[in-house]
Structures are given as structure tokens and as C-alpha cells.
Amino acid sequence: RDKPADDDLSDDALAERFADAVRDLWANVHGVGLLRYDGKVWRVVDEALLVERARTYLRDVRQDATALAIRRGDKVLESDAKRLGNKGTIAAVARLTAGILLDNSPTLDADPDVLNVQNGVVDLRTGTLRERRPEDYFTKIASVDYVPGARSADWDQALKAVPKKTRSWLQRRLGQALTGRISVDKSVPFLTGGGDNGKSAVLGACSAAAGSYSVTVPEKLLLGSDSEHPTEIMTIRGARLAVFEELPRGGRLNAQRMKLLASTNELSGRFMRENFVTFS
């Protein structure tokens, strides 16, 4: 596709150029909304921020176009440049740019075999660490650095409270949870017993380390009927460790929903006032 000429100050041409200028750090995703890269993750942001970015971009374009018009003695170009500071022009360019970005919508958190951590990206297949890139399109990040071979006396002590016959199994399941893949047995673990068996300490530590990869599941997701609003399921989009803290007295699990969550590679839901989106 041909690039618009630098002296083409139509809304369409300006939006094309503005989209090229921001697409490395801005994205628009179906069913999610507008996102901006902060150096570690892509975060959902208000559309007003794109309008503000368009304002500063058009201010620079206006200055350059005005200088060019004066050198040429081009009164038409000079007049066109003046309108780039108008609220309507700024809003129109931002709106068109959002559509251009949506037309090139990326897939978020797509690679199940890598983990975004504070000091880079871990390849879970090899244990190697690499630099983070915007094109990874992470929306989640662990709260800790990756340090190969690291040990913690507190963690070792917490594990000792877990019954010995289930200790290694629990460690494997929690480790597997950091991948984006469904467990081989397609089951949902339930941790039961009194308050002295280490379950709260172990889950608390893992959830804290997993950062935004860990979520607390709302009651309605597992207890509600199938007719509940689909926004509930969006709480686990991109999550790798989902914890349902405690079954309320008299509560009944939705068996069909449990089976779906444990064995389905793709789920569908939507945020409030957004379109449905399918995610892994």
C-alpha cells in the first residue's frame, strides 16, 4: 500500500501516518480494547490517552507543515495545517487510528511455553532467560525475577507442612500451572484438611510469585448457573494459576462449568459492553 504524502493533511492520511508512528507501543484488540505497552506488559488504557497522543503528534505535524507552507508560499497548505489543532480533527484522527490498529489486532499471551518475569522472559522448555519484546504481547507478568537454582528456607519449611504423600505431586502441579497448557489428567485439584497442612502458605506463596498470572476465581464462575453474565469467565483470561479460595457453606459447584474449565483449550467470554472474545 502506498504511503500518504507528507503534505497530505486529510484525516485519512494523517491516521495512516499516526498508526505507523504508534503501532509498536499501541494495540487495539477485539473484545479487549485499546492497549499500550509499558516496557513489561500491555495494559488496557482509556481511549482518551490515544486522543492525547494524537494531539501531540498533530501538533508536531502542524508545525512542520506550516514551515513547509511558508517556504513554498503555499496558502492552501498553510490553511490546512491550522486545522490540525482543532478538537474535531484530533478526535477524528484518533478514531480512525483505533480502527487501523484493530484491523491489525494481535493475539495476546499466545505462547504457553514462555513466562514473563521481572528480569526477562523464561523459556519453560529450556529454562533459559531472554530479553522481553513488545511483540511478545504479554498482558501478565510474574512478580519476581527468574534466578536458576534459587532456594528459600521459608518455602522449604512451608512444604514440610504438606502431607508427604502428596508433597511432590502438589509441587509438580503448581509448576505445571506456570505453563499455559492444560494438565494431562484434565483435573481440578482440591486442597482439603485443617489449617495446619500448609495449603494456605503454599498457595499464598505461589500466587504471590506468579503475580498477575495468578487470579482469585469469583464464586459465580464455579457456582453460578450457565446463564450468568459471561464477564465472569474473563477473569481467567491469560491466567495460569486460578485459585478458588473456599467453597461457601451450602454452595454447589457447577459440574458442567468445572468440566469446561478443566478440559477445554478455548473459552469464550466478554468484558462489559465489549464483544465476545475466544481465548486459550
What are the functions of these language-model segments?
Residues 1-142, 264, 269-270, 279:
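Intein modules and their embedded homing endonuclease domains
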Residues 13, 49, 169, 201, ...:
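Charged, alpha-helix-enriched surfaces in structured cytosolic catalytic cores
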Residues 25-48, 55, 107-109, 114-240:
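P-loop NTPase catalytic core of nucleic-acid-dependent motor ATPases
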Residues 193-195, 206, 246-251, 271-273:
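Active-site proximal loops enriched in glycine and acidic residues that flank catalytic Cys/His/Asp
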Residues 231-237, 270-280:
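AAA+/SF3 P-loop NTPase mechanochemical coupling elements
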